[in-house]
């Protein structure tokens, strides 16, 4: 599958988010998820990434956001939100099964678009009123 660039490790600084993580105006669970995806997308665009696709659905999985770094690296982004950090919080909620589904979906997208670019898997987590960007959160070889 895709390969990571050497300099892709590290985490972003937490960004203050509205005190209430769950916007009431979104209503449904799907609406709330879409609101968080929009917030994550805007944050990543301000950080210099460009949107390639959103809510990519392929057999077996979905990718919340596909972004592109300035150097061409494809960034597959999982957006997670939790009202509190009980049970490990938002980022910890991405288990082995979820990572496998993300990898399958990313591989299908990557292959469909030519498969030439480096890529990585990031997580944008909303937790306790904060946005945390976990760059290179996991790799294809440690998903299982």
Swiss-Prot record:
Pfam families: UPF0102. Residues 16-28 have a biased composition (Basic and acidic residues). Residues 1-28 are annotated as: Disordered. SUPFAM superfamilies: Restriction endonuclease-like. Gene3D superfamilies: 3.40.1350.10. PANTHER family: UPF0102 PROTEIN YRAN. HAMAP family: UPF0102 (MF_00048). Belongs to the UPF0102 family. This is UPF0102 protein BURPS668_3819. It comes from Burkholderia pseudomallei (strain 668). The lineage of its organism: Bacteria, Pseudomonadati, Pseudomonadota, Betaproteobacteria, Burkholderiales.
């Amino acid at each position: 599958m895709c390969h990571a660039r050497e300099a892709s490790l590290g985490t972003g600084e937490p960004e203050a988010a509205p005190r209430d993580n769950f916007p009431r105006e979104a209503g449904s669970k799907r609406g709330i998820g879409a609101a968080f995806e929009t917030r994550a997308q805007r944050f990543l665009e301000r950080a210099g990434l460009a949107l390639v696709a959103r809510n990519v659905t392929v057999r077996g999985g979905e990718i919340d956001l596909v972004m592109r770094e300035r150097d061409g690296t494809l960034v597959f982004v999982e957006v997670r939100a939790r009202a509190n950090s009980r049970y490990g919080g938002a980022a910890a909620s991405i288990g082995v099964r979820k990572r496998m589904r993300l990898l399958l979906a990313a591989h299908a997208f990557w292959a469909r678009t030519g498969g030439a670019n480096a890529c990585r898997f990031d997580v944008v987590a909303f937790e306790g009123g904060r946005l945390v960007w976990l760059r290179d959160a996991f790799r294809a070889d440690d998903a299982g």
